[in-house]
């Protein structure tokens, strides 16, 4: 993963290079992404098959925002294809926040925060954490992460009840490939 330095710790104009070097049999493949940017710290790079086609994909998690108690990410997936030449194609990935909005219903009644995920219901009493002034409704997304594990892409984000973000739990989303995007 190669990028130009923008300013401070920020980087932009990314190039993904796969293969190459002395041991390369097929040569290297490079893909340029001039609109990608990373605000701080090092991005995460993974090389794993996450759509069960037997071909390793490139997963890049860029930091889109960072500060005290905040770390938001932008996820990019390059699916490897052979048609008949080996290449990588960027495919859409639903953001963790969009996935949570679609899959999770959060509500607050008194001291209790309820998360409805499908048919499962989770209830947390936020006062047991020592928080006094909750946000209504509870929020998500101040800390985000994406990572593949055993061939599956996961996204996680936190649930908070006060500003600054007072964590009461995390939500983990398992992504699947529907042939057009990861959701």
Regions found by a protein language model. Name each.
Residues 1-42:
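Terminal domain-start segments
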Residues 3-6, 14-21, 70-92, 174-183:
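Beta-propeller blade repeat segments, especially FG-GAP/WD-type strand-to-loop junctions
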Residues 4, 83-85, 93-183:
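Acidic, small-residue rich beta-repeat scaffolds with periodic aromatic anchors
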Residues 41-50, 142-149:
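Beta-propeller blade termini
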Residues 42-43, 59, 71-74, 139-142, ...:
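Short, surface-exposed coil-to-beta transition loops
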Residues 50-62, 149-157:
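Acidic/hydrophobic-patterned starts of short beta strands in beta-sheet-rich repeat architectures
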Residues 61-64, 116:
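Beta-strand C-termini and the immediately following turn/loop, strongest in propeller blades
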Residues 64-68, 160-163:
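Short glycine/acidic-enriched loop and turn motifs that connect beta-strands
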């Amino acid at each position: 993963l190669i990028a130009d330095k923008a300013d401070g710790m920020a980087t932009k104009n990314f190039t993904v290079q796969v293969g190459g070097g002395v041991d390369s049999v097929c040569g290297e493949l490079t893909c340029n992404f001039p609109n990608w940017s990373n605000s701080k710290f090092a991005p995460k790079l993974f090389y794993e098959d996450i759509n069960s086609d037997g071909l390793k994909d490139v997963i890049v998690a860029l930091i889109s925002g960072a500060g005290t108690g905040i770390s938001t990410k932008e996820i990019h997936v390059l699916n490897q294809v052979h048609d008949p030449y080996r290449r990588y194609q960027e495919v859409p990935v639903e953001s963790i926040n969009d996935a949570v909005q679609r899959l999770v219903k959060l509500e607050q009644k008194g001291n209790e925060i309820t998360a409805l995920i499908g048919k499962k219901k989770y209830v947390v009493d936020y006062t047991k954490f020592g928080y006094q002034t909750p946000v209504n409704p509870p929020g998500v997304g101040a800390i985000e992460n994406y990572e593949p594990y055993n061939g599956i892409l996961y996204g996680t984000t936190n649930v908070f009840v006060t500003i600054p973000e007072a964590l009461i739990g995390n939500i983990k989303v398992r992504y699947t490939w529907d042939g057009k995007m990861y959701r």
